[in-house]
């Protein structure tokens, strides 16, 4: 004004559009506005978000209809979630993860660069990194895929219908065959290949025998 320049006003649809970001507090306030809009979009598309105030989903995530997201869940970028899934509470999905229809990722779980097949259950206290998990697999509480050997990230393959017992540690690379079973607390060494319908137990894991053809051990 003092230099003779004109001053113009800009009208915005709402006050939030004109928020300035000059401090860390301003940044947090603006991020909360954006997060709310992202969640509103998902809910309008048929996703149930139980508590939007305690749910964090990045903008480029894709989630199918009738999936339920429970509180204290963090879903980061580049993630695909199918229809009729259940995620959380207290779950963290990291980039590169794909979850097929009707799968479940429960409380205190972390999934990174992992694919979960249809109707697979990962319900309690587990970490899956760089895993390729088939359909109708049950992952027990406390299971870990130890994907990093200090130099490389390695992949764990778990085939359809497998049953991974609680507290199993799979030191990648590992292959678990179709409808195979790992015993609770088993430590499966790097490079192990468990045959279809095989049973592995112990520390280190040893293959006991193969099962007769059977249905999946869980409904």
Language model features with spans:
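Terminal amphipathic alpha-helical/low-complexity segments used for targeting or macromolecular assembly
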Residues: 1-53, 59, 66, 192-198, ...
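Secondary-structure boundary/capping motif
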Residues: 4-6, 82-84, 178, 185
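Short low-complexity stretches enriched in small and charged residues
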Residues: 22, 92-97, 154-158
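Residue-level signal for inorganic ion chemistry
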Residues: 23, 69, 137
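Short, conserved secondary-structure segments in the cores of folded domains
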Residues: 45, 57-59, 77, 95, ...
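Acidic, glycine-rich loop-and-beta core segments that form the ion-binding/anion-interacting portion
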Residues: 50-110
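Glycine-rich hexapeptide-repeat left-handed beta-helix
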Residues: 104-219
């Amino acid at each position: 004004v003092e230099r003779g320049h004109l001053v113009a006003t800009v009208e915005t649809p709402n006050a939030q559009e004109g928020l300035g970001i000059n401090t860390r507090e301003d940044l947090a306030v603006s991020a909360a506005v954006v997060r709310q809009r992202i969640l509103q979009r998902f809910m309008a598309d048929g996703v149930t978000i139980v508590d939007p105030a305690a749910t964090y989903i990045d903008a480029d995530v894709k989630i199918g209809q009738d999936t339920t997201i429970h509180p204290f869940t963090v879903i980061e970028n580049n993630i695909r979630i199918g229809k009729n899934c259940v995620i959380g509470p207290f779950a963290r999905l990291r980039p590169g993860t794909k979850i097929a229809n009707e799968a479940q990722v429960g409380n205190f779980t972390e999934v990174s660069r992992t694919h979960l097949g249809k109707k697979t259950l990962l319900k309690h206290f587990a970490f899956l990194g760089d895993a390729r998990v088939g359909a109708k697999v049950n992952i027990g509480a406390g299971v870990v895929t130890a994907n990093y050997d200090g130099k490389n990230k390695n992949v764990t393959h778990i085939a359809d219908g497998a049953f991974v017992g609680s507290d199993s540690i799979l030191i990648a690379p590992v292959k678990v065959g179709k409808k195979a079973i790992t015993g609770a607390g088993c430590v499966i060494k790097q490079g192990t290949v468990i045959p279809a319908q095989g049973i592995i137990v112990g520390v280190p894991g040893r293959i006991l025998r193969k099962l007769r053809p059977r249905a999946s051990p869980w409904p």
